[in-house]
C-alpha cells in the first residue's frame, strides 16, 4: 500500500468537508444595515461613542493634584519599574517647547484626519445639527479640566499641525497642564514665550500653515507613535519621551 497516497486521501477529507460546508452558507449581504435609529441630537451631542471603551470600562480613579505633583519629581526609570506591563506604553521622538520642563497630568484625547470632500461635508452636517466644531483644540478650550493634558493624534511626522499660540492660550486658561501632539504645531516662537513656561507642548515638528485636518473622535482611544492612549491615562512627559498608563 502506498502510504503517501493514503495520507493524501485522509488530508483531502479534512479539506473538502469544510469547503463543502462553506459553499452551503448564505453569502454575506453587503447591503446589510442594522435596524438602529439614533435619538434626535445624538450625533451632534459632542460625544464620540467608543464601543471598545464600553467594554474596557476603565476605572475612574480620582488622581489628586498632590499625587500628580509627586510624579513631577519621580525619575522616569522609577516609573518604568513601577508600571508593570505598561512599560512599553512609552512614546518617543518629541520636541518640547519648554526644554527640561516635565509634563504631568490626565489624558484628554482627540483624533484628527486629513480632509476630503465627503468627510468635510459630514463635519458640516454635524455642525448644522448641533454644537459641533471640527477644531477639537477649541473644544478643549471650553471643556478641559485643571490637570488635563490634551493628547492629539495627527499622523506623526507625516501628519499636520494642531494649533498655534492662540489655541494654546484657550486650553491653558482652562487650567490644563500642557499638550502632546503626534504631529505638528505652528507659532513656534510664541509657544516658547515666558507666558507658556508652565505649559509645555510636546510636538513632532513646527509648520507655519493653519490647521485643516478634521477632528473626528474626542476622548476615545488614540494612537501616539507606537502606543495606545486611553482617556484618563496618567501622562508623564520628560526629556526623551512620554509614559501613558492607567490611573
Question: Can you say where each PLM-predicted feature lies in the sequence?
Answer:
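Bacterial N-terminal signal peptides that target proteins for export
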Residues: 1-9
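Bacterial N-terminal signal peptides
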Residues: 9-21
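N-terminal low-complexity or amphipathic/hydrophobic leaders
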Residues: 55-130
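General beta-strand structural signal in soluble alpha/beta enzymes
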Residues: 92-94, 151-153, 179-183, 201-203, ...
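Extracellular/luminal Protease-associated
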Residues: 132, 138-183
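Ligand/cofactor pocket segment of small-molecule handling proteins
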Residues: 172-211
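Acidic, glycine-rich flexible loop/linker segments
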Residues: 204-247
Amino acid at each position: 500500500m502506498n502510504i503517501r497516497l493514503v495520507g493524501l486521501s485522509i488530508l483531502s477529507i479534512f479539506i473538502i468537508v469544510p469547503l463543502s460546508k462553506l459553499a452551503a452558507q448564505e453569502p454575506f449581504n453587503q447591503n446589510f444595515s442594522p435596524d438602529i435609529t439614533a435619538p434626535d441630537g445624538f450625533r451632534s451631542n459632542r460625544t464620540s461613542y467608543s464601543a471598545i471603551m464600553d467594554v474596557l470600562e476603565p476605572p475612574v480613579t480620582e488622581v489628586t493634584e498632590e499625587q500628580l505633583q509627586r510624579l513631577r519629581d519621580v525619575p522616569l526609570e522609577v516609573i518604568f519599574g513601577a508600571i508593570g506591563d505598561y512599560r512599553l506604553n512609552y512614546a518617543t521622538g518629541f520636541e518640547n517647547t519648554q526644554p527640561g520642563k516635565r509634563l504631568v497630568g490626565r489624558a484628554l484625547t482627540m483624533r484628527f484626519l486629513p480632509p476630503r470632500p465627503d468627510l468635510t461635508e459630514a463635519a458640516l452636517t454635524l455642525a448644522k445639527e448641533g454644537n459641533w466644531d471640527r477644531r477639537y483644540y477649541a473644544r478643549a478650550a471650553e471643556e478641559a479640566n485643571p490637570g488635563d493634558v490634551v493628547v492629539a493624534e495627527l499622523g506623526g511626522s507625516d501628519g499636520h499641525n494642531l494649533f498655534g499660540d492662540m489655541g494654546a492660550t484657550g486650553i491653558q486658561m482652562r487650567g490644563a497642564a500642557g499638550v502632546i501632539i503626534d504631529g505638528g504645531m505652528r507659532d513656534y516662537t510664541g509657544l516658547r514665550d515666558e507666558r507658556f513656561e508652565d505649559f509645555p507642548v510636546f510636538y513632532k515638528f513646527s509648520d507655519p500653515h493653519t490647521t485643516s485636518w478634521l477632528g473626528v473622535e474626542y476622548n476615545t482611544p488614540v494612537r501616539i507613535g507606537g502606543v495606545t492612549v486611553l482617556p484618563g491615562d496618567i501622562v508623564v512627559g520628560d526629556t526623551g519621551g512620554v509614559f501613558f498608563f492607567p490611573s
